[in-house]
Amino acid sequence: MVRPAEGALATTPVAHESHELFGGDSTTCIVSVDADANGRARVWRRLGEHVELSEHTFPNWFLATSLELLAHLPAERLSADWLRQQHGHIQVHEPLAVVDLETSGPADQDAYRYLVLTSNLAEIETTLLETASKREGEEAQTLAELRGLVLIWEPVEQFLTLTGRTYFKDMSFEALRRFQFDLETTGLDEGRDRIFMISMRDSTGWRASLDIGDLGEADLLRRFVELVIARDPDTLENHNIFGFDLSFLVRRAARLGVRLALGRDGSEPRLETDVFDNGERPEPFLRWRVVGREVIDTQHAVRRYGLAAPDMRRHGLKEAARYFGFASSDREYVPGAEIWATYRTDPDRVRRYAAHDVDEVDGLSRRLLPPIFELTRRLPRGYERVAADTGPGSLWELLMVRAYLHAGRAIAAPAPRLQRVGAPARSELFMSGLLGPCARAEASPLLPRVLVNGSIAATNDDLQVMPRSLGWLLHRSDDSAARLLATAAHAYLSSAGLFGDPHAALDASMLARHYVELLVRDLRAHGCTPIEIDAEQVVFGVPTWWTPEMERAVSESARTYLPAGVELEFRARYVALYARAPGTSITLAHDGSVTLVGPAFRAGRLERFGDRFMHRAAACLLQWDVVGLRAVFLETLSLLRGGGIDLNDLCVQVTLHKSPSQYRRGGTHEEPYEVLLVEDSELTAADADADYYVARLSGLYCQQFAQAFTREDFSRIFRIPPGSGPFEAADPSDFDDIRPIATSLV
């Protein structure tokens, strides 16, 4: 139930240790914000079973380096003192106002010295763009494209930054009302296929299922909307919710004339562009925005987790649930292509399958989203935006801008990005090939501590916001959100962001590498063989006499040279390790598990047959079983030539951003979509190009093991025999003289 607020929201200054990390306003329990370019904001707060709505006006704003493009417009001029006094309560009485921000020294012509406040952003934007086009030759379409002259953020972020509010203050993740739903459809084309079932549950334990056994499709969608309104969730969640469920739902509703009033104001979902960034690379996607509710894709959370967990090979819902161990023992599985046919003969089986789907989405949400919830408590960004984008710039930039506005300070231009040599490589390999018992140790948290202890900051961070904030974060080592922010600090400093300074970042990297090299020297003194430096981690071979007591001795020794607050932590121990390249290795743990680490082994880029081959081959290699390695190769070769591998296992998984009907309308030729359009054809593995896949096996997958053998021995193990197989088992005597090797690279 949504009820209007009886009065204005409290704006008491926040009592946390650092307003820079939590915002300067103490308003509690915000679960969603909607704001627009006309200076209107709506804020929803969860108060137990009820949701309170309050409406606000605020000036839209942007930062500018010059007022030249606005010189012909009348504007109220305000001081930095006024801004400091009004922070959190800012209102202007003229359509345009300019705050002269304080500078730390002589005025920098490239500094963002002006905070421009307006009650008519659309008109100001049009005027600015026209003037820029005439005077500067800038052909920008939006203010965001005038970077260097203007900095602007989207309206929700403007509202939160200006007011000092954040989501979720004094609220637990368990108090958030989360709603999971999953569609079952007759196919993937919303133009011709239908929704025949929707399974639902929420975080209170309520659950329901709708299907066309009782309703027509249009009535099914209407009833779904009624249930969402009645349950009034704060979040809508599913796995690949943007790539499939909401897109399909919106387009089927439009085709059937059903108003999909899922917003808390009765509005329908609207499409926006957004960016998914897990810290590896930004990836644009189309987001469906539901007013008053945050839309969360658990696939984003799984992909983010998978970047740091090389043993997570796939990011699908079922695979992730099995990985985390909450897939039910009686979990119902139905192959995707068979779901509609199964429903027609055994609808209860499909109902169980769909119910298990939403249970697993809830499990992923509970497992992976609490740190994002805690991050959102600190940042002037919406929960759904933080959940999709945890790139370093998204975490730090607005946080720092908020601190500078709170202080009424201008933001100087970033330091010029001049070429500077000597930056240490993130990963450095000392040995390649197969090595015996090994361990992995990490000096943690080294880079954040170096930044704090040395007060290392960007040249234009004259308020020292980053090192001061980092100091607070490092005292919260048990806080997962604090760790995420602290870990991202150096990456942001290295970036081309507003407070990026690659020279300062390089100074920190060089100092951190110095400490890691001291650790390498110490390990050698204790009889260990360094194999690789990987950022703040060192992988090393251990002597036969290595004991837990020796680990403790190395840890004690490390305290004498590592910075205060940095501890040496032993992360893992391995029976054997194959070092292929910097940042790329295969390990055998004491429990027998094999883990492939590094971009060359990223499962999403590999056919399943190749991924399976490498795991089996690696298990043989790491146990010095050359005969077994040859047998795995021959077996895989025989299956490929004989059409014995399932067609799905010959495919590379790709993410599609358009529906089949959208692709058809586009008139382009894109191979993944062409494959999708013939998915119903009777293709089998026998139709696959066997020679192509044999070449993939030999030229890609086998080559991953080349550093483990001499060139001659490698050729003998992976020699391709004539014929289609099956092939005779390898004679052990043929390989008696082959031994895996290790090679020193220094």
Feature-to-residue mapping (PLM):
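The two-metal-ion catalytic cores of nucleic-acid processing enzymes
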Residues: 1-428, 432-439, 443-466, 470-480, ...
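Conserved catalytic core of nucleic-acid polymerases
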Residues: 153, 440-631, 635-642, 646
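C-terminal, non-catalytic extensions of nucleic-acid polymerases
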Residues: 555, 563-746
